[in-house]
Regions:
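Structured catalytic-domain cores with a bias toward divalent-metal coordination
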Residues: 1-242
Length: 242
C-alpha cells in the first residue's frame, strides 16, 4: 500500500483532555488491505490538529495503521492474521507476535475500543457485538449494556452478535468430524485462537466493538468510519455538543 510506512514501530496519536473521562482507543488497518479505518482516523487527526474538534474530557488514542507490514504490502496479513490468537507472547515467533506485544498492553490501558475494518464482498456496513453479561469461562463479560449502546450509536443499522461462541462451536464441530489420529494436524483447535482486538479488550476489563465500514473499495467506507468515531466521542461525552 505504501513503501514509506515503517514496519519497526507503531505511530500513535494521543490526545489527553484536562478534564477526566473515558479512555478510548480507535484502531485501523489491523488487516493491511482494509484502509478505510486509516483514512477515517487520519481525517479525525487533522480536525483535532486544526482545532475543528476539541477533546473536552478523557483520553483519546488513535492508531491508524495497526499492522504496518500488512499495510505496506497491501495485504490482509503480514506473516499471520493479527486478529486471531491475540495475546502477548514472551517468545515472539512472527511479526504479528511483535505487534501483539505492543498492542495488547496498549489496549489494556483503555476503557473502550472502536476497531475499524472493511470486507471483501459487497454489502452494507455492520457492527460486531460481544456477548451478554456472563461469568462463563470462554468470554466472561460485565459491560454488555455499554457495548450495546456504543454499537447503536455508531450509525450502521446491522448488528451481528456472538463471534467467539460461534468460533468455539466451529472448533468443536471440526474436532468431532476429525479422527483422533488426524487431530494433531488441525490448526486453530483452541477456541482462544478466535481472540482478536475486541475479545482481548474485554478480557482486560474494557469493552469494544468492531465496525465493518463496507466493502474494501467502497468510497463511502472511510466516511462511515469517520462518522462512527465522531458518534463515539459524542456518546461518551468526550467532546462537547455543537
Amino acid at each position: 500500500m505504501s513503501d514509506t510506512v515503517p514496519t519497526s514501530a507503531l505511530r500513535l496519536h494521543s490526545f489527553r483532555a484536562l478534564q477526566p473521562g473515558p479512555r478510548l482507543i480507535v484502531t485501523g488497518a489491523v488487516h493491511g488491505n482494509e484502509t478505510c479505518g486509516s483514512r477515517a482516523i487520519e481525517r479525525l487527526v487533522g480536525e483535532l490538529d486544526r482545532g475543528e474538534l476539541v477533546l473536552a474530557r478523557g483520553c483519546l488514542t488513535l492508531l491508524p495503521i495497526t499492522n504496518p507490514l500488512a499495510y505496506r504490502r497491501g495485504q490482509r496479513m503480514g506473516e499471520r492474521n493479527l486478529n486471531r490468537n491475540l495475546y502477548p507472547n514472551p517468545l515472539p515467533q512472527d511479526y504479528e507476535d511483535h505487534i501483539a506485544n505492543v498492542l495488547c498492553p496498549l489496549l489494556a490501558q483503555h476503557d473502550v475500543l472502536l476497531d475499524l475494518h472493511s470486507f471483501h464482498s459487497a454489502g452494507e456496513p455492520f457492527v460486531m457485538l460481544g456477548p451478554k453479561d456472563n461469568t462463563d469461562e470462554l468470554e466472561p463479560f460485565s459491560h454488555a449494556a455499554q457495548e450495546e449502546a456504543l454499537a447503536l450509536a455508531l450509525g450502521p443499522r446491522r448488528i451481528v452478535e456472538g463471534w467467539l461462541p460461534t468460533y468455539a462451536q466451529g472448533v468443536k464441530s471440526r474436532l468431532a468430524r476429525t479422527s483422533v489420529a488426524d487431530r494433531a494436524r488441525l490448526l486453530s483447535v483452541d477456541p482462544r485462537y478466535g481472540v482478536g482486538t475486541t475479545e482481548y479488550m474485554r478480557s482486560q476489563g474494557g469493552y469494544g466493538v468492531t465496525l465493518e465500514c463496507g466493502q474494501h473499495d467502497d468510497p463511502q467506507a472511510p466516511e462511515v468510519g469517520w462518522r462512527a468515531i465522531r458518534n463515539t466521542l459524542a456518546m461518551l461525552q468526550m467532546v462537547d455538543a455543537p
